[in-house]
């Protein structure tokens, strides 16, 4: 075992001089808010995940909430999320004022229990939010099967919901940018997909996120008299993809019908406020980071694959369970390395985290289930109703996984972890 103390942070951003130079150029260009770099990054993201459009925002949370606004949900409408996730998946329901429904995990699997998901669907269910936890694409085939089976319960409230014709699948892809399943990229599989580009993510714009969608009718024209977003004037010949993109711009910029870039044209000062909406746009400084990260992302992912391979090899003889990041039909983004200490308690797992910290290695936990959190207890959720989610949490430890790790760092992490587990 390597006894020389090292300092191993959990997930620092991987920045180079290239990102610094692009940010400098953005600042000196005089265009630091939403502008040409943001628009360029949107195009690159849509091309990367094979969708017609992408909208850059300031977080995945904003993207997840944007979906609920685009669907124009009502207070009685229900959104189903897993209990085993980060708060953003669920909190957006409270932002828009609809009803939150939680479903337990599968036994020994971080995905939702799909049988329980089917049971949770009612005539009020409008959206299901699967989570690509750790960067592993969820079983969307199963989710689509379930919503087709429950199609008879679906009652649309507007023209967009009616056009979709069933419960909407809004993927929480905060972890899975760059992941794929059965030849499709995260971002093109679900109806709507929300990505996070936060500083701890594989691909980062410091803060930031993006929304993509893939609707079979996206290139069809929207009837000018469509019963949908009645305060927003419809344009003759505008497609659903174009309208949704325009709505995202409105929702992210106070409902203002001209962004700063459009207002730079001579005599184009005048604008209207279509709705009293939000401020969650991406800036060109953030996008500058993203443009360079896109150039580097293939290499970033490949290094993550190698780190996970080395972790798997080092831990293979321990009494632990880890996520399956790569298989014949899928490849995750390799965002998190979750380790469950089989037969151990939360207290045992906490001891491991403390002992790793004493050796300079930062670990984490993904996740404490939402029904254990104060905010969700106050909404009436009880962890006793989500035993599988609790079982996943009770002995979980996340090891550092990032591209600043050297081969020597990986050896240091794994040798210390193995030593601590064997002496626990």
Q: What spans do the regions from the language model cover?
A:
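Conserved PLP-binding active-site segment in aminotransferase class I/II-type PLP enzymes
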Residues: 1-70, 74, 143, 239, ...
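Glycine-/small-residue-rich active-site loops that bind phosphorylated ligands and cofactors
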Residues: 15, 33, 85, 108-109, ...
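PLP-dependent aminotransferase class I/II
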Residues: 39-43, 51-52, 115, 127-131, ...
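Conserved SAM-binding loop
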Residues: 56, 81, 102, 211, ...
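PLP-dependent aminotransferase-like
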Residues: 69-173, 180
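Structural detector of well-ordered beta-strand residues that form the stable sheet scaffold
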Residues: 80, 101, 168-170, 194, ...
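Conserved active-site segment immediately N-terminal to the catalytic lysine
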Residues: 157-205, 236, 269-273, 322
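Glycine-rich phosphate-binding loop of ATP-grasp-fold ATP-dependent ligases
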Residues: 206-210
């Amino acid at each position: 075992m390597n006894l020389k103390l090292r300092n191993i942070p959990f997930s620092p951003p991987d920045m180079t001089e290239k990102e610094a130079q692009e940010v400098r150029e953005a600042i000196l260009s005089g265009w630091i808010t939403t502008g040409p770099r943001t628009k360029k990054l949107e195009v690159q993201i849509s091309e990367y995940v094979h969708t017609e459009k992408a909208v850059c925002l300031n977080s995945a949370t904003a993207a997840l909430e944007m979906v609920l606004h685009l669907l124009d949900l009502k207070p009685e409408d229900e959104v189903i999320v897993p209990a085993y996730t980060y708060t953003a998946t669920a909190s957006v329901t409270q932002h828009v004022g609809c009803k939150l429904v939680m479903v337990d995990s599968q036994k020994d699997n971080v995905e939702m229990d799909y049988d329980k998901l089917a049971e949770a669907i009612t005539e009020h269910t409008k959206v299901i939010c699967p989570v690509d936890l750790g960067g592993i694409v969820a079983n969307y085939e199963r989710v689509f099967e379930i919503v087709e089976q429950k199609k008879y319960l679906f009652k649309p409230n507007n023209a967009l919901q009616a056009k979709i014709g069933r419960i909407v699948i809004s993927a929480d892809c905060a972890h899975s940018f760059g992941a794929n399943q059965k030849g499709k990229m995260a971002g093109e599989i679900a109806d709507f997909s929300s990505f996070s580009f936060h500083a701890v993510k594989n691909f980062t714009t410091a803060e930031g996120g993006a929304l993509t969608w893939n609707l079979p009718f996206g290139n069809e024209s929207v009837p000018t008299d469509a019963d949908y977003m009645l305060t927003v004037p419809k344009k003759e010949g505008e497609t659903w993809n174009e309208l949704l993109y325009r709505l995202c711009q409105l929702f992210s910029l106070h409902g203002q019908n001209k962004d700063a870039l459009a207002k730079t044209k001579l005599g184009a000062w005048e604008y209207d406020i279509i709705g009293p909406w939000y401020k969650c746009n991406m800036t060109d400084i953030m996008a500058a980071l993203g443009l360079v990260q896109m150039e580097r992302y293939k290499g970033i992912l490949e290094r993550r694959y190698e780190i996970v391979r080395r972790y798997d090899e080092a831990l293979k003889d321990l009494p632990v369970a880890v996520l399956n990041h790569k298989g014949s039909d899928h490849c995750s983004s390799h965002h998190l390395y979750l380790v469950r200490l089989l037969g151990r308690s939360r207290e045992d797992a906490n001891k491991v985290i403390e002992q790793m910290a004493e050796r300079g290695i930062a670990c984490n936990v993904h996740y404490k289930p939402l029904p254990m959190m104060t905010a969700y207890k106050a909404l009436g959720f009880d962890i006793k109703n989500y035993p599988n989610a609790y079982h996943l949490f009770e002995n979980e430890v996340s090891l550092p996984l990032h591209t600043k790790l050297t081969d020597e760092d990986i050896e240091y992490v794994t040798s210390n972890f193995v030593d601590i587990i064997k002496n626990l």
